Curated annotation (Swiss-Prot):
It is found in: Cell inner membrane. PANTHER family: METAL TRANSPORT SYSTEM ATP-BINDING PROTEIN TM_0124-RELATED. Disulfide bonds: none annotated. Belongs to the ABC transporter superfamily. It is a peripheral membrane protein. PROSITE patterns: ABC_TRANSPORTER_1, ABC_TRANSPORTER_2. GO terms for cellular component: plasma membrane. This is Probable metal transport system ATP-binding protein CPn_0542/CP_0210/CPj0542/CpB0563.
């Protein structure tokens, strides 16, 4: 099995004297993994994803990403990122196509002009998320579920080898939750996925392993009893949805 991400003794804190946000975190992510990242608020889930994305630098330890030799990609373009929140001005008439096209910025040449391959990547990404007929729709007029799918398409426009998502099914209706999870399941055939979530009931069956983050990391390879285990967790009332809606 090919390693895609390797972390050893990872720790992070803000400033030289601040408390560790995470500490002693070690894990491996392999090609084809679909990993759920769970844990209480303040447990370090977001910090971990920022470290993987290269937006934060470890205070101690090491974290390495390994692109495939055939891809020839830099780290910043081998990882696609779908944030939980996307700030935009609802009065600005940006189209779905332009939002997805922004996912190609890391691929632009020095003169900064989009080429035919960039527009083809947008078409392909929108087709993957089932929005191929929404190119010219106004982004601000979409439903919550459609917005999440557009953000997923934006991440897919760079043809990433690794996809990281921060609670992509939060605050959207059950039909769109299921649609997004089904899309991710198909994408997992060719893409390694890490997904932060609080919703164990609807997502557990999609994961082949789970990372539980609460300052440090526990890797759980067997997800078959995961829901029962964490329904008894003291954070369940604030954090985890373990029963059907």
């Amino acid at each position: 099995m090919t390693i895609r991400i390797l972390a050893e003794g990872l720790a992070f804190r803000y400033g030289s004297k601040g408390p560790n946000i995470i500490h002693d975190v070690s894990f491996s992510v392999y090609d084809g993994d679909f990993i759920g990242i769970i844990g209480p608020n303040g447990g370090g889930k977001s910090t971990l994803t920022m470290l993987i994305l290269g937006l934060l630098t470890p205070t101690f330890g090491s974290l390495k990403t390994f692109p495939s030799h055939s891809a020839g990609k830099q780290t910043h373009s081998m990882i696609g990122w779908v944030p939980q929140h996307f700030s935009y001005d609802p009065c600005f008439p940006i189209s779905v196509k332009d939002v997805v096209l922004s996912g190609r910025l890391s691929q632009l040449s020095w003169h900064g002009k989009y080429k035919k391959k960039d527009f083809e990547a947008v078409d392909h990404a929108l087709d993957l998320v089932g929005l191929s007929d929404h190119h010219h729709h106004c982004f601000a007029h979409l439903s919550g579920g459609q917005i999440q799918r557009v953000l997923l398409a934006r991440a897919l426009a760079s043809y990433p080898e690794i996809l990281i998502l921060d609670e992509p099914t939060t605050n959207i209706d059950p039909d769109n939750q299921q649609r997004i999870l089904s899309i991710l399941k198909k994408l997992n055939r060719t893409c390694t996925i890490l997904m932060v979530t609080h919703d164990l009931h609807h997502t557990t069956n999609y994961f082949n392993k789970v990372f539980y983050m609460n300052k440090t990391l526990t890797s759980l390879a067997d997800t078959s009893t995961l829901t029962d285990q964490f329904c008894c967790h003291p954070y369940k009332n604030q954090e985890f949805s373990c029963s059907p809606h």
